[in-house]
């Protein structure tokens, strides 16, 4: 295995209506607080339960927000991005980049520790038991063979 992780990157327009607790998410990033190495973008750090973003369901933690109401978020200080969100109005349009991890390896491959795979002992115990029975039968009946 080469250790490479592949991602499928998609973009989506998400329209939110500001609720009593704002837009319902927190952000990280900016030119002064890089969240991702060599990327000064603005990312969703937390979705607030029952907030506008959670009720909509499309915005996810880790999503990169590219623009707010058509205004690009590139090369902004963190506080400038926060101010942009706070002053965005009641109806807010977000251009968002989702990164989905893509399976790396052959089809049907299970990663180590994957709970949906069959545990190794579930295979080894029956194989060991069958081997023991075969060895016992061979020893018991070898004179008759």
UniProtKB/Swiss-Prot annotation:
Cytoplasmic face residues: 1-117
Subcellular location per the Swiss-Prot or TrEMBL entry: Mitochondrion outer membrane
Keyword Aminoacyl-tRNA synthetase on entry: no
Membrane-spanning intervals of the chain: 118-138
Protein's UniProt keywords contain Membrane: yes
Pfam families noted in UniProt: PDZ (PF00595)
CC per GO annotation: mitochondrial outer membrane; mitochondrion
A Gene Ontology BP annotation from the UniProt entry: negative regulation of endothelial cell migration
Predominant localisation class: mitochondrion
Key words of the record: Membrane, Mitochondrion, Mitochondrion outer membrane, Transmembrane, Transmembrane helix
Domain of life (superkingdom): Eukaryota
Stretches assigned to the PDZ domain: 13-100
Mitochondrial intermembrane side: 139-145
Annotated function: Regulates endocytosis of activin type 2 receptor kinases through the Ral/RALBP1-dependent pathway and may be involved in suppression of activin-induced signal transduction.
Subunit structure: Binds (via the PDZ domain) to isoform 2A of SYNJ2 (via the unique motif in the C-terminus). Interacts (via C-terminus) with RALBP1. Interacts (via PDZ domain) with ACVR2A (via C-terminus) and ACVR2B (via C-terminus). Forms a ternary complex with ACVR2A and RALBP1. Interacts with MAPK12. Interacts with DLL1; enhances DLL1 protein stability, and promotes notch signaling in endothelial cells.
Protein name as annotated: Synaptojanin-2-binding protein
Organism: Homo sapiens
